[in-house]
Every structure is written in C-alpha cells, then in structure tokens.
C-alpha cells in the first residue's frame, strides 16, 4: 500500500513536469500501458489467495485511477496551452480594411428606362406591360395599320406564323389597356421590341417607351406641355424643342419632336400625335366623347444622346470597358 502511494506521488510529479503531450504519452505508457507498472501489479494478483485478491485489486485500481486523473488533467492543460499559443500566433488585426468588392452597376439602358418611368410617374402616368409575342390585331389591325402597310412585311417583322409575331412596338400594350380599362387612361408602356434591322443606329432588339392618355378633353396642347416637361427634365437642360408634322397610321394629327443639339443641329427624339378615331373605335371607346394622345420614344436613342454614345451596338456587346463608365 505504501509502495503504491509512493508510485502515485512519483507519477504525479513526472506528469506535472512534462511540457508537451508527447512526453505525457510516454508517462502514460510507463504506468498504464500493456507493460506498465499497474498492469504488472494486476498480473501479480494471481499469487494472492482468493480472500486477499479483491481488496488488493481495489487498492491497485484506486491508485491507477489517481494516475489516470492526473494524466487527463495535465493533457487538458497542455491542449489549452497549445491552442492559446496557436491563437496568439494567428492574431488577426480586425481593424484592417477588408478586400474591396467591386460593385456592379445598372446598364445604361436600364438607367434610362428607370429615369423615364420616374419622370412620367411624377406626371401621373402608371407603368403598363404586355406580351412580347403579339397577334396581328394588337400589333397592327387595332392601330389602323392596313394589311398592305410595309411594316407588316417579313422584311421588317419577325413572324412565327401569319398572325403571330415578335411585337414591333409596345403600342399593343396601349390597345390591351384600352380593351380592359375605361377612360381616363394615363399610362406608359416600356419594353423590348423587335425589328429586322441591324446597323450603327439599329439593332434587331431594342427598347421603347410609349405613352397614352385618353380622357374627355385631351388636347394637342396638353401633349406638347407634357413632352416639353419630360425632355427638359430628362436632359436637365432648357432645350430648344420643335414639333414638326409627320405621319403615323395610329395618330392624326401626328408630329415628330426634335431637340436642338450642342452642334446647332436638330436631333429627332420621339414621335407623337392625337389618337386616331379608328383606334378608339377598335377598342370600343367612343371618339365623339373621348380623345387621346400617344407618344413613343426609342430608349437606346435617348441613352445615346444623354451619354454621347455614337454606336447603338455598344449597348449590347457586354464590353466591361464601356459599361463601367456608367457605374
């Protein structure tokens, strides 16, 4: 018994004296391993009588447990010390700035659409949307565009079948709105449109914003005032603006709107006019009671004029050197 107490004391002293886990494992093997001190002591129990064996075994196990507890306690302390040392070596300066993430930006065409929606929204216009695949009635017939009109040929229009096509303008949204809503109507219809054309100033897909107002006393004077306000707010300049006579099948009278450029030349920016009575009749609105006006503009053209871009195709080539200028 006294010998075991001495061994336990010696083991505890050795355990407290180690400074790393490898040395601690050597002590564990020395005392608790297959050939360790306590294993040999247990083997010696066979030499004792059956009456002495249980008491002696209990004493040995108690001493063995004391050594095991000392080993566990020391191992935990060493592991904590190793962890603290590792954490100290890997200290992070949390005050250092992080890696800069480059933020994206809206496409210039998207910026223009949002700007147009906001400016007309301030004048009481709501945004209306419709399908990009249209039928002949909504894309042509209801807009007073006859069957022989050149816009209806496959040179200008992408057809799926004789009566189904990619819309060539967002005017179909105006027709659908008038079919389902009684005047007063005050909407703009932004969206993608498609025409069979491709050069520096045309692409097969481009964006339009068309507007429509139908009420009992809509007038060309009101149309001019709205477009004057829009253009001056859009370009943020007190522009010189002119309305010159033009022709569109769906408006009468019709006009095109020009602004004076910095080079002293007129630049066409949009078309407009009073809604043709035939268009109102096609959707069940009485032209004797109601009148209306409509206008339409190419978003890419307005974007080119605002940002000084010369080639329309640059908007669709995904060149980051170009797009980063608009962030």
Curated annotation (Swiss-Prot):
Catalytic activity, EC: 6.1.1.20
Main subcellular location: cytoplasm
CDD domains the record matches: PheRS_alpha_core (cd00496)
Pfam family for this entry, one: Phe_tRNA-synt_N
GO molecular function, one term: tRNA binding
Catalyzed reaction equations: tRNA(Phe) + L-phenylalanine + ATP = L-phenylalanyl-tRNA(Phe) + AMP + diphosphate + H(+)
Biological process according to GO: phenylalanyl-tRNA aminoacylation
InterPro entries: aa-tRNA-synth_II, aa-tRNA-synth_II/BPL/LPL, Phe-tRNA-synth_IIc_asu, Phe-tRNA_ligase_II_N, Phe_tRNA_ligase_alpha1_bac, Phenylalanyl-tRNA_Synthase, tRNA-bd_arm
Protein origin, superkingdom: Bacteria
Binding, Mg(2+): 252
Record keywords: Aminoacyl-tRNA synthetase, ATP-binding, Cytoplasm, Ligase, Magnesium, Metal-binding, Nucleotide-binding, Protein biosynthesis
SUPFAM superfamilies given in the database record: Class II aaRS and biotin synthetases, tRNA-binding arm
Cofactor requirement: Mg(2+)
Co-factor binding details: Binds 2 magnesium ions per tetramer.
PROSITE patterns recorded: AA_TRNA_LIGASE_II
Leading EC class: ligase
Family: Belongs to the class-II aminoacyl-tRNA synthetase family. Phe-tRNA synthetase alpha subunit type 1 subfamily.
Subunit organization: Tetramer of two alpha and two beta subunits.
Protein name: Phenylalanine--tRNA ligase alpha subunit
Organism for this UniProt entry: Aeromonas hydrophila subsp. hydrophila (strain ATCC 7966 / DSM 30187 / BCRC 13018 / CCUG 14551 / JCM 1027 / KCTC 2358 / NCIMB 9240 / NCTC 8049)
